[in-house]
């Protein structure tokens, strides 16, 4: 009899002993241990039947014990072929562990557990998750080490789920419905057969992500929005983007690489894109934690300026392409005058392209502020009638567009045609936008400014203005007190003191002021002169490339404008001209080959400061935005620095015709003398 009882104990465990043994046999302690566990469950609310090799739930437990108050049930390490029916009747159950059993399917009665928040089904033989599992208020779902081939589409209905572990399964893809898990913090898909990760994962507030030991070759760019991510595990994957050397450096380098890719992909849409794609905009913390103040404790440290602060400023690398700057540039360019629109439409059939960077550069705002301060009382918006302020604001976007290098030739031809048709130097172009009392003032200022531009010497005009101001020249009366006659094409404007001359906000004036040819006499203002030929930006770029390659002793990239925009080459040039003039240079790393806009601007500002220390006049310097955008004025500043400090003057951009003829004559004469000398020696 004892041998007959020992065999069931070895084969079937304690449950077999409890059901086949008789009182007094060795199986009695197993029954007593199960009964003791049930008694403790009634007293404590926690049922622990783990590691007992049970195939069935203890019989008669529901009739003998009141288990309605059980909140935690541990049925792990047993041999249940399915979820016990008695466990599905525990309506107060909040946590259920069926770890390491023999489950092949789940009982539909699990849907009765309306208070269940924790469910552990790992180390079983499940091949699918039924839909009724997704109707439970689960916060933790663990189904690792099973045979799941796919997740159900209803997985997105688990809105309160915070941890999902589906590791060590046979998943080949993840459903896009995962984006519905708005509370998910921990996602573990380790040891599956995943080849791609859905883009929607970037919208989740994940803190921990593990997709190691899969077949993933590319991390989605949208993952750069996972700003709360603390841990990311991606080993044992054939990753190609980001490269392996980037992934080995850690989480910060991975996210910087993804942020750079996102910026390049956003800028590749072109200026005609209506706005930046919403998939690259960082989600605010208030959307993830409504009603709570977010203190940055879960940030990843990406793009942090201070190494001690683990704060990811996700907007810092995308300020220039944000939707706010796009709307500002749109509002600044909409209220343009009808004549301006007509000229744009007749001269160029292409639509007006939007320049995100040019519309919101701090350097341009500072330059515009200095021009406003130097404006005389007649032309300032606050001195006379307040209604003239909108008109002056309408004309500013046109001046911004004229400074673009690609429209230089177009605006040159347009200015020349208008001046030839007007019959007088500097006839105003936008008379229809101004009041009659202001037309003569603007016309006179434009006339004197245009004549000063023809002289090719804005510096002399400024010096004359300063001299006149120092001698106490009388200031003209405000335009609002006495209306002036309208300036026509045949009437020349009355002479005005040079101290009140206003610099026009014109690209042609800036170009001519950069290539001034010397001081001009007072009577030269009334004498028309031939236009100086404005140097082409391509010629400037070619000459600057030759100078930089000869100075730095190394070849430069093909796209020199983009290389100069980072400011690294300019700072190296300054240090080559005068050692230690730029003490600190921001250089790109192999992982992130492109500098951020903030670091590039700091390099450019350091170069301009070094130029000031080397003796380059302030009038020959440009704003940081000119160097960042690669305009002709910025290129000329770099050449001027080499010219001032390099010890020898640069070759001129266009040699004078008289000098060229003399050079040709001299070369021909030397050749004739050489031929004559050789013939004399031969004879």
UniProtKB/Swiss-Prot annotation:
Database matches in InterPro entries: CH_dom, CH_dom_sf, Leu-rich_rpt, Leu-rich_rpt_typical-subtyp, LRR_dom_sf, LRR_domain-containing
Signal peptide boundaries: none
tRNA processing in keyword set: no
Domain Calponin-homology (CH) positions: 534-647
Compositionally biased spans, kind Polar residues: 449-460
Modified-residue entries (Phosphoserine), positions: 279, 281, 304, 307, 309, 313, 432, 457, 511, 513, 517, 521, 589
Spans annotated as Disordered: 1-34, 268-292, 326-436, 449-539
Bilayer topology: Single-pass membrane protein
LRR repeats: 41-64, 67-90, 92-113, 114-136, 138-158, 159-181, 182-204, 206-226, 227-250
Low complexity biased stretches: 1-18, 461-481, 511-524
Domain of life: Eukaryota
Transmembrane stretches, start-end: 653-673
Keywords attached to this entry: Cell membrane, Leucine-rich repeat, Membrane, Phosphoprotein, Repeat, Transmembrane, Transmembrane helix
Swiss-Prot/TrEMBL GO biological process terms: membrane raft assembly; nervous system development; positive regulation of toll-like receptor signaling pathway
Classification via CDD domains: CH_LRCH4
Gene3D superfamilies xrefs: Calponin-like domain, Ribonuclease Inhibitor
Predominant location: membrane
A GO-annotated cellular component: plasma membrane
Protein name as it appears in the record: Leucine-rich repeat and calponin homology domain-containing protein 4
Organism: Homo sapiens (Human)
This protein's encoding gene: LRCH4
